[in-house]
């Protein structure tokens, strides 16, 4: 069991669709044992086998499906594929979800 590690990653998102996308996609990766993303604090709790997948690979994968992490920024192309409801870089979308926060890496749309 020495290869199994627990970690927490900050992953941006604003709704239950984001939660489902993040958890369902990440759990499908080889080496991921557990994935649980919290909408309120944006923390993804992971248990993974470091011999099968690295933390860097996990960050890159999350960015590839459109979600910024505390270490990796999703390309505009990947981000723009998200449902409009999930576009967490847009202040109005965040506000519409009843949230009062900025994206992890700042915003590319008008804020307040």
Segments predicted by a language model, with ranges:
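Short, low-complexity, polar/charged sequence segments that are solvent-exposed and flexible
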Residues: 27-31, 54, 63-67, 90-91
